[in-house]
A protein has these predicted regions:
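Macrodomain-like recognition of ADP-ribose-binding/processing modules
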Residues: 1-210, 214-284
């Protein structure tokens, strides 16, 4: 039997666009009430007014660094019996990022495997989060407000599960430095504030198991090591003992290696899988 044809970049993009439309149609037909309920359950978490500190609930936080997609980690962690909360590396202005245009970054991959996209596109969520950002880009560093959506259905390989989602945009370091000449120290400070706000959101919503990753380290141009070290410092200081388990899901191998080096005492797993892409949809 001959191997399937390997798609080039443009063919993959067209395939992703087609699957995005399929997800949208399927969700509208089969999950309309659930989408409405999730939209109503989504809450805006404003930026903390003071430096947040987490509740101490556990003697130690178990940390694992995995080479896999966020969706892979969601499926794996829920199969372990955990209630899971995952960070969506979101667009500041556009629900789902470039989901309908065929891109496949972290946010888009979440949308391909869930009903997250129509929830983010709902009128209520748009007005709650995206509309308030118009004209308020903060020199491309954006703001530390975010959305919390509980129990979003995800599916992969015939398995359906649920995970709560924190939708938050990282500082766009590349744009901030290219167009606004923002210095490194202010970019780092913005990322420190953003990560503290993400962990605060998970804490106040009583989440114990988090899936994080190389937040903002793609087109936004943040440094993987710096982001990993900020997460480490927050989890060892202000949020020490706040979470039972934290998984860093990093699909790109070089970024995985850097992340793993920052957490030498953590469990490391290289999970060789095909590139994260279109996923089969759940049942009615």
């Amino acid at each position: 039997m001959s191997e399937p044809k390997k798609l080039n970049y443009f063919e993959k993009k067209e395939q992703n666009k087609a699957h995005a439309q399929q997800v949208i149609r399927w969700a509208s037909k089969n999950r309309e009430k659930e989408i409405q309920a999730l939209s109503e359950a989504t809450v805006l978490m404003p930026a903390p007014s003071v430096t947040p500190e987490g509740q101490v609930k556990f003697e130690k936080t178990e940390i694992e660094v995995m080479q896999c997609s966020t969706v892979d980690a969601i499926i794996r962690e829920t199969e372990r019996g955990a209630r899971v909360c995952a960070l969506n590396f979101a667009s500041y202005k556009n629900p789902g990022g470039m989901f309908t245009d065929g891109s496949m970054a972290q946010e888009e991959s979440l949308c391909h495997a869930s009903i997250l996209y129509p929830v983010l596109c709902s009128d209520r969520v748009r007005s709650l989060f995206y509309d308030r950002h118009k004209g308020n880009l903060n020199k491309a560093l954006y703001l530390s407000d975010m959305l919390y959506t509980p129990d979003v259905p995800f599916w992969q390989g015939g398995v359906e599960t649920k995970a709560s989602i924190i939708t938050c945009a990282a500082p766009n370091k590349k744009a901030a430095q290219t167009y606004q000449k923002v210095p490194d120290d202010l970019c780092k400070l913005a990322m420190e504030d953003r990560i503290a706000a993400v962990l605060h959101t998970a804490d106040v919503n009583q989440e114990d198991a988090l899936i994080l990753g190389a937040f903002g380290c793609g087109v936004f141009g943040n440094d993987v090591r710096e982001v990993a070290e900020i997460f480490r410092d927050q989890l060892e200081c202000a949020f020490r003992g706040t979470f039972k388990r934290v998984v860093f899901a990093v699909l790109d191998h070089p970024s995985y290696e850097i992340m793993a080096s920052v957490y030498p005492a953590a469990t490391h797993q290289e999970i060789e899988k095909e590139e994260s892409g279109c996923c089969d949809m759940g049942t009615n």
